């Protein structure tokens, strides 16, 4: 593998920074937007949820866009669009204007979270494909940490406009790098551009047998037309579709973005006070989560996907049980243990779900369906995200912290059994081998059973 091949994957993965920043920056900005615009609880939930609704729209359109104009061009356009929408949100003078800007921002993010994992999966050398997809989660976490830190540093001035507007900076920085990157050989072959495909492979892995790789890809694409959603809900890909839809929904409905979006409120409910506790501590938690991703990053291609994923889910279950006890106690004497519960949840999520969900999104479908498959998975994920963003504060008022984390804990147990039963181990497998797994009814062709 060459530095050029690594650069292609890492540049695309760096788009995760802008996604991560938006996830966490709203946590701090929401506190001050609520003061300036005198928002009710429901309106605060709407400010958070509007970007998720936009993401659903973007996710539904992303597969078609990526197949039509390519993975690279899609990534360049969405990055530029994100910068513009971030500035519009920062300049909002009313709640409707802010909601509209957040909606458009969400569309750009929705396209990004579909196209970027596909771009990385199709660009990266096989030996490090899993690690580079995990690196995408690393960049999301870097963005999340930056969002909390910016919110903390600007909290005293209540400068929510700066918190939102700063999001445009990483997008502008990334654009020149993205413009220089090639598209993927698989997309070029989908469009019949053989010479472009050959050049793309040579730039990524100049020492590899390019002609052999082109032949393998061409064989996989032979007699394949444009991917259609209708094909995904029929055999042999129905099983893969159901798997990624359920997995995507469980990733969010188990509560990760409740902690990211509303961490200041959660910490306050546990008894924490002050800007550092409400915005600085979440940044420290995410820093620990980043460490967990690095461990996963260097382990995924050696240990495999399943052991890491299942271990992370177990940590989340233990964390939910801990938080349920802390909130049920409600004496304010368990602050350290409560912080530990949040910390363990974030570490477990980022070690397992957060690191590997994008691996399955990029690996579960053949080339013609890969963008559509990622769109379907993200749409499912965002549906769970929208439910969390739109109703968490209301749930907290109705059920209390103990009730909310009891619900999250039960859903995480369900997630464990789903992954244990249905998630394939794809370590060391070529993308076309993984396609045969799903075509064979969820069994590897060499299995005797």
Which residue stretches match the model-derived regions?
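Alpha-helix N-cap/helix-initiation sites
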Residues: 207-211, 277
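Short, well-structured alpha-helical segments
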Residues: 210-219
